[in-house]
């Protein structure tokens, strides 16, 4: 179902909606997890006991520690190049990325807001317009919701003229269109020219110069 995990799998309903399937759970992809499943015992991590699918990774602090390897997990795929990755965007590169990525996202995954925070009808006028015409200069990007496995499910892009809420892991990966930047794998190899992020298992930081730094893991949606 996916190329490389970030150390955890994802529930099917967190990616595609619909009814949850019992055999597609969010769980740690570790040797200890396999043993825990067999013996019905939890896996011990620095933040306490992680029961299978207990949702701890949905909290931002724990998810960041997980991606930064401050929580040690003996993952089955921990040596894979795409197990961890990072992307740096300058302020201008992020503006360009969103301008190119936003028109690719299905309208049903987007909710626009005006400067006062009221829902806007910009979506009806969006076709063919640059993101800067709708949002203005991008001021910040924040992930606002994660699934139990830590997968980003909602993200808000704040602009000088308004904001847009992006829902769904695929839409989030599309809107931050990384075509003009390099994806740096954990083995320090680099790839470029991608049309979407490797996965939605990432967090984002903005520095004082206005550049954005993404730190993530895995390649694919993670269901399986």
Report the location of each language-model feature.
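Conserved, single-site charged/polar hotspot
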Residues: 1-224
């Amino acid at each position: 179902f996916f190329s490389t995990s970030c150390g955890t799998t994802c529930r099917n309903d967190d990616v595609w909606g619909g009814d949850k399937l019992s055999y597609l759970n969010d769980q740690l992809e570790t040797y200890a997890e396999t043993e825990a499943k067999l013996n019905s015992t939890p896996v011990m991590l620095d933040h306490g006991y992680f029961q299978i699918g207990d949702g701890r990774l949905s909290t931002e602090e724990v998810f960041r520690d997980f991606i930064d390897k401050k929580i040690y997990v003996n993952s089955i795929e921990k040596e894979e190049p795409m197990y961890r990755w990072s992307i740096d965007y300058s302020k201008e590169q992020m503006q360009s990325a969103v301008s190119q990525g936003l028109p690719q996202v299905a309208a049903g995954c987007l909710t626009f807001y005006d400067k006062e925070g009221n829902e806007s009808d910009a979506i009806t006028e969006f076709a063919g317009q640059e993101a800067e015409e709708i949002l203005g200069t991008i001021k910040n990007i924040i992930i606002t919701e994660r699934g139990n496995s830590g997968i980003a499910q909602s993200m808000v892009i704040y602009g000088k003229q308004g904001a847009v809420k992006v829902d769904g892991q695929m839409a989030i990966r599309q809107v931050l269109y990384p075509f003009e930047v390099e994806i740096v794998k954990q083995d320090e190899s680099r790839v470029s020219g991608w049309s979407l992020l490797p996965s939605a298992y990432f967090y984002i930081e903005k520095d004082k110069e206005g550049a954005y730094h993404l730190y993530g893991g895995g390649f694919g949606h993670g269901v399986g």
